[in-house]
Amino acid sequence: VDVPPLCNFILPAIVRTGPLAVAISTAGASPALAKRMKREIAELFGEPYANLAVILNEVRGWAKATLPTYQDRRQFFESIVGGDPDPIELLRTGRVAAVRELIEDAMRAYAPVA
């Protein structure tokens, strides 16, 4: 029974796309608003973001094995995510190979010199 005064928990609206999940809550104030926000967030952060998450996950092992510190790994991934060209825009236009090239360039730039 949905009787807010008798409830002691609230379920968020959740947007799931690939490995991404975004939870939205209005603390029970407005399920209709949460539904609208869920729809808008799904449109804004859809497939390109999920695809980038999958691609970045593919290089996590390399980063952990190659880059010695958390700071090094953070800089590496931030250089890709905030890179120029923007990987999200590349994915929105179907240019997956260009994103992979961007990542390969970052791997070469951040790999320790042997």
Question: Where are these predicted regions, by residue range?
Answer:
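An accessory alpha-helical subdomain
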Residues: 28-114
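Rossmann-fold NAD(P)-binding glycine/threonine-rich loop
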Residues: 1-26, 33
